[in-house]
Amino acid sequence: MWFKNLLVYRLTQDVPFDAEALETALATKPARACASQEVATYGFVAPFGKGEDAPLVHISQDFMLIAARKEERILPGSVVRDALKEKVDEIEAEQMRKVYKKERDQLKDEIIQAFLPRAFIRRSATFAAIAPKQGLILVNASSPKRAEDLLSTLREVIGSLPVRPLTVKVSPSATMTDWVKTQKAADNFFVLDECELRDTHEDGGIVRCKRQDLTGDEIQLHLSTGKVVTQLSLAWQDKLSFVLDDKLVVKRLKFEDLLQDQAEQDGGDEALGQLDASFTLMMLTFGEFLPELFEALGGEEIPQGI
């Protein structure tokens, strides 16, 4: 269990996360299949294992892992538009009258309801790790919307979840721009070979570089004309690599072979043991990595009143 993306949320108050109580709460909203006329469903699933006996909360040391699954019917907009146009044309031709917006919207709803039972179904899972001692919730997602779906559903079942996206004192873009300009990142961080540069003007240009020497004259020229770094590939120690963006989203996390080999040794022969070992090692690594990342970005910002 290695996260591929990371959105970090700060608990703004102490929350007494009790594994047994959390298990009971999550069980009140289990994931389920869409009914024939439902567009989507959302609920909690076991992060590891299958079947009714698989726990909805996986506990390892001081960490908890939960997972939510979304099931949605995929109805392409083009299919609905074509069917609606055909129906509107038919009515206007047969009844010799214009179909206006209110009726058009009603027809569209009827078409969607007729097509839903035949629509393809897509399932997606989102994992979140809770670290109560650190006051953090880490979501394996690059989309804030996807993370908020999980957090709002968690809030719904436990009653209260005082949490906010973690922010830092210095703009990540400003820090990353400085690292590329000076060709030196903070201690234990190393600039790799990929970045995105944007003009600060609203309609300004975007330059995306991959497998390129970011210390070269071409990159420095872009920076000298006012572009700033909005995404940057980095490595931390010899343990992981990732892409950081200007919204503090960590993407394309890759844990180096050394960590994966250690987890494989720790986990034994069973699949569940392997998953547990990798999750534990990942969380312990995050326990070192995240404080260093936030410090490198100017330190965590604590809003007034919190």
From Swiss-Prot:
InterPro entries in the record, alphabetically? Answer: RdgC
Would you say which domain of life the source belongs to? Bacteria
Subcellular locations according to the entry: Cytoplasm, Nucleoid
Instruction: Tell me a Gene Ontology molecular-function term this record carries.
Output: double-stranded DNA binding
Query: Which key words are in the record?
Result: Cytoplasm, DNA recombination
Name one process (GO BP) from the record: regulation of DNA recombination
Tell me which GO cellular component terms the UniProt record holds. bacterial nucleoid; cytoplasm
* Function recorded in the entry: May be involved in recombination.
Q: Which family does it belong to?
A: Belongs to the RdgC family.
| Name of this chain's protein | Recombination-associated protein RdgC
Highest classification ranks of the organism: Bacteria, Pseudomonadati, Pseudomonadota, Gammaproteobacteria, Pseudomonadales
Q: Which gene encodes it?
A: rdgC
